[in-house]
Amino acid sequence: DSPLFLYDQLSVSWNSNADLRNSDAGSRAASVNYSIPFGYWTLFAGASKSRYRQTVAGFDEPIVYGGTSKQVEAGVSVVPYRGASYKGTAMLKFLRKRANSTLNDIDIEVQRRDVVGYEFSYGHRHYIDQMVLDVGGGVRGTLPQFSDQPGYVYGDPDWNGRSTILTANAGLYLPFKVAGQQMAYQVNWQIQHAKTPIVPADYFTIGNRYAVRGFDGQMTLAAEDGWTLRNDLSLDLGELLRAPGHQGYAGLDVGRVGGPSAMWLSGRTLAGAVIGLRGRAALPGAANAVSASYDVSAGWPLQKPESLKTASPVFAATLMFEF
């Protein structure tokens, strides 16, 4: 919504795993965000709260890792340059995060965190005919001089609370036609490298619906460094369904983690496949004021450590409403 009628935007969201009555597994999250543009600049602020519980593949046996977090943030973004076929975007924000963690249902006192941090990112988008190319990078970290409880790094009791994480990403979207049918290929690559010791909450995690699909997310691989490669091949179903905005798709993902803590994992690489249906439509009788988007899929693990247990196939569904 636009409460001040200044092209500002207020959004409120809540999400959960499908088993709403099971408070011992999965995740819950809620957030509120507000932004207001001024020319090529945009000011934004937000707050969020989340709870999660997952099983991580350990060296000898699975580890049940969980926790809660609360975060407030504010920042600014700017479009430093733009042209008919390209655009650049830069963003800087500061945040305060409070979190606690549990290991096998036991509170980890040394992992209680109350930290102040920052994040800077830069992205460039380029249009080449119908192809869209995205590249970007960023850095995020903590400001220990303003933090009450920076957390604890295993094996480094003298850690000063300062962390620095470098990130990079690249993406390609390529639409094309086969026998008159509209199709598209999309690939996205992401990488993280920790320049300093970091707490487990900042590890790069793979094996869920966001990073290497085909796994149920109850057991994951996580370490200081990592990368993922996500591939999607989609088919426009608008003509077949006589309604625009719907796609069938197939995906193939691979990811790998690394860093000092990866030596304790039973494996470092995951690969998975997924097929699904996604789309967006205005709800009937709502005068286009309410729209719904959905994504339903089935996935399968293709490569994993033997000790990492997951359902197969993995069914996932997402339903979102916009007012």
Regions found by a protein language model. Give the residues of each.
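Acidic, glycine-rich active-site loops and adjacent beta-strand->loop/helix elements
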Residues: 16-20, 49-51, 255, 298-302
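Short, glycine/acidic-rich beta->alpha junctions
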Residues: 24-26, 68, 114, 269
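Transmembrane beta-strand segments of outer-membrane beta-barrel domains in Gram-negative
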Residues: 37, 42-200, 257-260
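Outer-membrane beta-barrel initiation region
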Residues: 1-46, 82
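Residue-level detector of the transmembrane beta-barrel scaffold of outer-membrane proteins
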Residues: 9-13, 33, 42-46, 73-75, ...
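Surface-exposed coil loops of outer-membrane beta-barrel proteins
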Residues: 25, 53-67, 206-224
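Short glycine/serine/proline-enriched coil/turn segments at secondary-structure junctions
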Residues: 4-6, 21-24, 83-84, 129, ...
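C-terminal transmembrane beta-barrel domains of outer membrane proteins
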Residues: 154-323
